[in-house]
């Protein structure tokens, strides 16, 4: 999970509490020294949030459109399950391939920069001097001093240069990590995507099917409730306030659900069979 230091620091920021902010930094500074500050992998967190939100909204939209078009419950369930797994597999594979491509590009650029630092150190230093002067407005002497200090640690200089010059963050990702991201995306999409479908199945199968409007409302309420909770969870890792983040997710879900439902109703009433 996100570090306690970060949670306390954000709480202090939201409340404009300087004392709490200092306490959070001072207390957890000692924990950091002993390696006790555990941070959640930001890339995996991004994958989980994106996959879960995309899953629940995508399947919600599909079910809503089917219900609006007054498709039979059996057909809705078949269409929903088919789309759930098809989209989950597609999203997982896309995450794997994009992560692999990003990793390969990053490693290729890293090797190139390593070669240039080894064979053209003066030119590489001058590039960083120019960046410090042009981007950060350091004077010539300070820029050169910074470069000479950072160049003593070749790994730091390499990673810092890749970040400043190429906009790339050096990671230690291997192909197993890329595969892991793909699996996380698949599971996130599938687990949360099944929520609106499960609500529909529960209403139509276990409680008896009555009418299309009520079934839509059941799916609508269950989906928006889940999105609200996801929004609160997401706010723990962003700079948004919990309620603001949650309401934004609910608004997104409302639009994504209402549009296909209304389109289904209109098309059903205007297209002859």
Curated annotation (Swiss-Prot):
Transmembrane stretches, start-end: 48-68, 76-96, 182-202, 213-233, 247-267
Instruction: List the GO biological process terms.
Output: intracellular manganese ion homeostasis
> Which Pfam families does its entry note?
VIT1
**What residues does Fe cation 3 bind to?**
116, 124, 127
**Outcome when changing residue 113 to A:** No effect on iron tolerance in a yeast heterologous expression system
Question: Molecular function terms in GO for this entry?
Answer: iron ion transmembrane transporter activity; manganese ion transmembrane transporter activity; metal ion binding
Name recorded for this polypeptide: Vacuolar iron transporter
Q: Which organism is it from?
A: Plasmodium falciparum (isolate 3D7)
The reply to whether Phosphoprotein figures as a keyword in the UniProt entry is yes
Extra remark? Iron transport is insensitive to the proton pump inhibitor bafilomycin A1 or to the proton ionophore CCCP in a yeast heterologous expression system. Functions as a proton-driven antiport in a bacterial heterologous expression system.
Q: Which gene encodes it?
A: VIT
The family note in this entry says:
Belongs to the CCC1 family.
Substitution effect: residue 113 to Q: Reduces iron tolerance in a yeast heterologous expression system
